[in-house]
């Protein structure tokens, strides 16, 4: 009886939590990489820039994988005038030096990229999320890491404004002309993998209130895509997303803007494609979401004609060179 119960528990955990993230990265990587002699992006002017771009790592991991590296590099290259801030919970605070990892070494080559520690208690301070975060500390929930990420991104947008991107995006175009915008994933749901909002926008305040008032950490997406969809429907007084694309200063962009390939078709990123088709395929796309939850661990040859390999080569060439050397 015990053996069977233990086996079932393990299988449930495996199904809910998923396989280890790095199952596809079993090779040994060097801790440092020499910066390439490429024309570097123009460093941004000092002082607070209104268009900061934020990436988040809410786990304690400090070794960005190649897709993470490509996300940040592609954002840095398309936004040379912006600060690209990579906030990682596992980084030490104070004046401690950064951990020695290939990803951190490579991303440090870009003058507009900063790797900074993420202090969640400080981020949530003076927001409706502070009490929720204190309460959730002592309990186990199946989706706590993604839920922490959901909370962190809306707190960042509320407190600082700018652009938030998940670490499984490849950025194709400059995003600075987008303000108070989020992307539509499908006919029925919005997605917060990309957010662009002004600081202290009322929509983000409503998101934080809904996060706490209707909290349920046991349903996948309830605090993320479903939350944004709920709040947008209330914001616009609509029942269906089809009724309105924009209202009261907040705009939703169609799926091709950020989610041109639906999550159900994630394997298309690993299929060969004619390079001449790329511009047509993504003519209406700002950034490509790769659905890492589905695709993680899927291997591809960096030099192949796979769609993902071609996107790496074009939009994050420094990461792509590292992949060719070490994959």
Swiss-Prot record:
Q: What class of enzyme is it?
A: transferase
Quick one: a GO cellular component term?
Golgi membrane
Q: Which PANTHER family match?
A: LACTOSYLCERAMIDE 4-ALPHA-GALACTOSYLTRANSFERASE (PTHR12042:SF17), LACTOSYLCERAMIDE 4-ALPHA-GALACTOSYLTRANSFERASE ALPHA- 1,4-GALACTOSYLTRANSFERASE (PTHR12042)
The entry's localization annotation reads:
Golgi apparatus membrane
Entry EC number(s): 2.4.1.228
- Give the classification, highest ranks: Eukaryota, Metazoa, Chordata, Craniata, Vertebrata
Organism name: Gorilla gorilla gorilla
Q: What is this protein called?
A: Lactosylceramide 4-alpha-galactosyltransferase
| Keyword set, alphabetical order | Glycosyltransferase, Golgi apparatus, Lipid biosynthesis, Lipid metabolism, Membrane, Transferase
């Amino acid at each position: 009886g015990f053996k069977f119960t233990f086996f079932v528990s393990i299988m449930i955990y495996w199904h809910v939590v998923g396989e280890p993230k790095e199952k596809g990265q079993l090779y040994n990587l060097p801790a440092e990489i020499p910066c390439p002699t490429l024309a570097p992006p123009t460093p941004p002017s000092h002082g607070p820039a209104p268009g900061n771009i934020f990436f988040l790592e809410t786990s304690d991991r400090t070794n960005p994988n190649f897709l993470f590296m490509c996300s940040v590099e592609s954002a840095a290259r398309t936004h040379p005038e912006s600060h690209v801030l990579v906030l990682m919970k596992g980084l030490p605070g104070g004046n401690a030096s950064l951990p020695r990892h290939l990803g951190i070494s490579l991303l440090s080559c870009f003058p507009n990229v900063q790797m900074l520690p993420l202090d969640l208690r400080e981020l949530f301070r003076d927001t409706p999320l502070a009490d929720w975060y204190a309460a959730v500390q002592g309990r186990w929930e199946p989706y706590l890491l993604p839920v922490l990420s959901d909370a962190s991104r809306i707190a960042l947008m509320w407190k600082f404004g700018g652009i938030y991107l998940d670490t499984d995006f490849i950025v194709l175009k400059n995003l600075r002309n987008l303000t108070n915008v989020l992307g539509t994933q499908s006919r029925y749901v919005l997605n917060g993998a990309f957010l662009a909002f002004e600081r202290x926008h009322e929509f983000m305040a409503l998101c934080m209130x809904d996060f706490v008032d209707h909290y349920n950490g046991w349903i996948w997406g309830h605090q993320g895509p479903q939350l944004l969809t709920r709040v947008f429907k209330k914001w616009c007084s609509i029942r269906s997303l089809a009724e309105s694309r924009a209202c009261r200063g907040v705009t939703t962009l169609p799926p091709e803007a950020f989610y041109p390939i639906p999550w159900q078709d994630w394997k298309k990123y690993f299929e060969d494609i004619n390079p001449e088709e790329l511009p047509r395929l993504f003519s209406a796309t700002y950034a490509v979401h790769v659905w890492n939850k589905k695709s993680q661990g899927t291997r591809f040859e960096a030099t192949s004609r796979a769609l993902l390999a071609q996107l790496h080569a074009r939009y994050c060439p420094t990461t792509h060179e590292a992949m060719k050397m070490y994959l």
